[in-house]
Amino acid sequence: MFDRTVNAKFKPASSNAGPGNNPVRRNSMLTPSRGVTIGGTGGNIRKLTKVSSLTSNHHFAVCYPPSNIYQNSNNAGSNSALQRTTSESLRLNMMSRVAAGATPTTVSRASSNSSLATSTSTSLAPKSSSSSGGSNSTPQQQQQQLVSSNNSSSSSNNSFTKASSPNNNGARSVGGAATSAATGTTAAAGSHHHQPHHHHHHHHHHHQHHNHQQQQQQQTSLSQGHASLTVAGGSASAGGGGGGGSGSSSGTAAGGTNRKPKTTSSFEITSVTVGHPKLNAAGDTGDESADDLDESHTDDNSRITDLENETPSMSEDTFSKEEVYYANNALSTNAPVIPTSSQYGLVVVDPIAPSLGQTIQNVQVNVSDNIINVVSGAVTPGGTKKKDDIKETQHRSERFKVVKIESTEPFKRGRWMCMDYLDHSSVGNGGNNNEKTGSSTSEAHAATTDGGAAGVGAGSEAPAHKTTQSMILPPTQKLNENHLEANSTDANWNYAEQQQQQQQQQQQQQTIVGNALTKTLPVALRNVSRSSSVTRSPNATVEFLSPNLLAQQQQQQQQLFDSVNANAASSPNPAGDPNNMDYARTAAMQLHQTLQQLKQREDAMDVPPGAGGYANYQNGGDSAVGAASNNNSAAAATGESQLSTSYVEQQQQQQQPLSPAPLTPQAAPTFAAVAAGQSPNFQLEQQQQQQQATSQIDGIVPQPFNPQQQQQQTPQQSTAQQAAAAANATSAVTAPPPQQTSNTSNAAVTTGQGQTMPLLSHMTSYEQQQPNLGAAAAAAAAGGTAATSVAAPQAIPTLQLQSAPSTIADPQQLMVPQQQQQQQHQEEQQQQPQQQQQPLPPANIASASANNSNLNLTNTNVVATGEATTNALTLTDEQATAALAAAFATGAAAAATGATSAAAATQQQIQQLQQQPNAESETESFITASNPGGNRKRAFSNPHIGGPNDPSFMHRLNPQLYYYNKSQSGRSSFCVDESLWPTNNPNGAVSDTNLYMGSSTDEDYEEAIDQFSPTIYTTRSASRAIPIPNSAGSSPQHQMHHSQPRIAIGINQMEGGGPTRSTGAFSASPSIYAYPHSPFYASSPETSFGSAAMPGHPAASSRISFSYDPAFQRLQVPNASGDRRPRSPLECASVFAAVAAAATCGDAAGGAADTVISSASGTSAVAIDNKIEQAMDLVKSHLMIAVREEVEVLKERISELMDKINKLELENSILKSNIPQETLQQLQLQLQLAAPPATPAIQAAPAVQSVVAPAAAGQAVQQQAAGAVAVTGVATSPASAVVPTSIPNGSAENGSSAVESAAVSVEQQVQQVTSAAAAAASVVTANGPMS
């Protein structure tokens, strides 16, 4: 969306749109038609439409009555019921519109050419539309409805075209612009169908459409995805959105290219070219060819998926496979959350899109699944396609780029049923995020509901709620869906409402930011797409933002600076939106402002580069388009290095947050923040960085703050930023010096938030939103300008209080404390690193280059370098985990390598961040590169890919170091031989701890993550590591887990030189996540482990944080101090061996006990843990089966009893009717006398009560049983406690155990109720006959 908006596309649309605002957003393809059709309101309305039209229950058009109304009208027509028909009619209308507005089409075309965004818009739109529909899909639909509606709008036409490829193609083709406009109209309809495909967003898109009606009901389908997709749509818009082919025919070539990304989804064939030709004919025949792929829904879908998997889409060409892996990691992290919630974390984008305007929504539509897809599609049409496929494959289990739905229920899109997404979402993130879609959706709902008006007010924020993560986070959101699902989603979703509000704000803000981001992203992606597949991959995680970040990172230095300048004016927009809270109004204003700003920006930046904008984007023109695109980029532009750092951090964070939603939101917020506080570009940039970090982590929080503060304090950028970003703001205030400070502050704040965030991207995002808001506010109040460290700590405590409580209390609290610790440590470290970091940046950059090979590490590193301290902190902030990892890297590296370690640490942080997104493929290498000692065996799939990043860590790359214990679990877990690692750490002790921790723990961590039991706790960052939100997403979680372990490690070793740092953060947070694996109660010995930090072994001292998931008993290999190294590979062989080795080796610093514990949680422990997890999974599945069977039996029994009751009642009524009046009265008297205390009715009530009690008891028992097996501690978890009251939600949100418990409880309740009913009936019957 941003892309579109930013791109010329937006401009052209602008003319049509008239109102700068909407057009800006809508601008892309849609804008023209929309502008024409909807005009300024088009965007808003569209947005609204999404909200209202979609019928999203929550978003009633009501939200934005003014704008909505138009949209509503259109959408209204295309309400769910009409959905497809309406959609088609709309599409047809659109066609006529297109015809009428050939200009729009032309504009579209120009746009599309000038900017991928345009292409994206249309191209994605089709998918998007599908997405939109999906978006509109239910719960999310509501949230995403806003977005969806936008998407819908934008993709409606397209969507239909695409969705009902055969039918719609013609329509879509009808005009990219028209399509867009139609999309607005059809969006509602489209959004419905979106939902189905929301799951596989684009691929599904088609079937979805086909099924979309059926799925439409499924509205659960994450609208987030589509929202994100919309972004892609924007990019594809030129391509007619591929499906639209002609729809965005204008951007035919681009569109076509964009389209390609869609090819990713393997099952996109549904949208066959058949439809396309028609549309294309209507639109541009030429586009057809370009959009042929699109035409063949395979390509189209692929593209969409690619877009969804921004990474794949983006850099599929470049990093076809690797990147995909990264994407996978990112996605996985986001659960392909970002793609899913991330990708529906991308949902975050969805919100973003709305924020920006309809345009973004268009993009978002596609974006949902491939937020970055928009960008991606625009950027790497061809590559995306492969990528998508790869990505699908990549996504560990989500071959289809499964959106992370936040539910444990299998997600069904058309013919496709996704059972696996859940775990991904647990990874969460993220994005994570993916798919935090459910989460995002909920948030979206909440946001929509809360911000129904907010949706409008928030501009696209209401849709933004979509995020995640995903929305990843969502943004963000989506990530959370799966990745964070355990924490964020399950817990979060349990907390969903609180966080939803946060998310809503966040998302909305994200939406705004995201919109800008989206704009930026597509550009960035374009640049990045080819240049940095890696970005793409991470983008996959932070689908939406990541590309932005990456692109920005890559181009940031080049373009960002320009972008910032160009966008400076626009930036204020977000700031201009003072009503963050009053989303409805504020959103409207914000939207207008944002759109206007975007428009201005486009005019300023985009117009000039309008035609060449595309080239600019790809080349470096990003600055122009990118600037326009990157509203927030403006800030980036100013402090390019900072921004890049920020962006990189963002990217990292995005990548890192397993849930895309959080990332996206974070990134988006950052952009919004940047836009808002863009007054001083440089300051803004810093703010941006801070905000980005904060944003990303708090993406939601900062934005809420930012928008409000921005508006209020736009003049006072610093203040606004401070308030918004709290610590970030502080940095912003002290722009240049604060860069470090800001970074540090950011890191600190983010750490507080981000720490949790990375683990639970979504959860964190949501959580952080509140905490950040609170923290930011507190920090701001406490003295936003106060020392960053101070601000960060303040923020963190606030975060802790707010965050922990609001989100999964335990995980967040756990995380928060860790965050605090980490923040403090990091702050300390940052201060050290700050000193080092300034110098380090070059080194980091160099490292970054090395890292880049890994994945955008270069950019990330650059950012990290630029923000060495920031990196540690920011990353921490962005990714508490990453920060921890960074801290660990920094600390460990510092300790081990001294000054170099700072750079290395930064690098590692970056790597960690990046790796998290790439968790599977690159995580390890990143980490490896980052910290010599801290290198974790992140590269789960790709062991030590990062190795090359750091020459010093090259050895780490050595495969020898990593032993994949494939036997342990389906996931090969690294059993890194500590002995192998010695090279990694200059300081044996520190290194060892780090290594072991990094290696063993990290690997274990990853393994654990995979297992859902991120149990790596660094001594210091143990608590951070705790946020095992990662556990939720098995595959995607990988990254997250990586992040966590990194964080843990990072914190643990963060001080590097400061052994004191070893906080031995208690990993014992009872972070019981929905996923049994997830809850590794962080109460690992690590906590107790004070981490005797030896000078030589800083905090590395025995990291007894063999955190074993209570659920999985995963004994993380505690990081014993440097002596760990002595461990022989055999240790991996057996726990006992490990224990013995640990005992024998005993860290010099760590006590023998530590060593023992450490060894206990050695690699062997990991293997054992993996096995345990496997066993748990098996038990869980068996339990689930048994429960289901039992439920079925109970249902049967209940039905039998009901039949009996009915029969008896019937008999009774017959008897009564036949009884003489006297007898009846007599009988009644007898009944009264016979059962005065309990009339049937009265009796039933007590029976029910009793039933409830037993149900609760049964639930407790069940949970205990499940908990015992899964060691989830569900029985004692709040969720379980709550389950009785909220069984439906609880079951879905809590782990399978919780679900089982819930099921059992339900069964019991039903049974008891039935029995009670039977008893009551029998009483009546007995009495009746008695008389």
Curated annotation (Swiss-Prot):
GO terms for biological process: chorion-containing eggshell formation; compound eye photoreceptor cell differentiation; determination of adult lifespan; dorsal appendage formation; follicle cell of egg chamber migration; intestinal stem cell homeostasis; mushroom body development; negative regulation of apoptotic process. Residues 1-35, 101-317, 429-471, 553-582, 597-665, 681-750, 814-853, 908-950 are annotated as: Disordered. Residues 106-165, 175-190, 553-580, 614-641, 701-734 have a biased composition (Low complexity). GO terms for cellular component: cytosol; nucleus. It comes from the Eukaryota. Residues 13-31, 263-273, 432-443, 740-750, 917-933 have a biased composition (Polar residues). This is Protein bunched, class 2/F/G isoform. It comes from Drosophila melanogaster.
